[in-house]
Amino acid sequence: MKLNKLNQKHQFEWFVGFAEGDGSWQTDNSNRSIFIINQQNPQILYKIKKLVGYGQINGPYENKNGSTYYRYRVGNLKGTKRLIEIFNGNLVLDKTQKRFENYLKVYNTQVSTKEIPLSEKRHIPTLNDHWLSGFIDAEGSFSGIIQKDP
């Protein structure tokens, strides 16, 4: 099944929000850009891999608490370029924007083609896009308290 353009746009908005909640923009010892998401549910990672078109999923791993998790990782140049196209100008949080800037800078030192400039545009989420649902899927929780009337 092919994604229609509107549905695909929503999926990318969701992915950016999810990545801002659970993603990690890193550089390794070889000065390469690497993007990682760790998740207990591997099915989410497979959906992300299909959406992006790049990456590897490894695991299961066990953390210090004994919980099992899986890892989505993109470290090759083609996959990194694709992620840059998705994230550049679409991030919301200052902390992820700063990490992304370094990620982009390192990528630009790796390629011999024209550098990709950092977009000055910033995404402002609304209730009509899917960034917030992605971020909540990564970081959110809801709770309620039922109290008896006095």
Model regions and ranges:
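Internal intein/HINT superfamily modules and their associated LAGLIDADG
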Residues: M1-P150
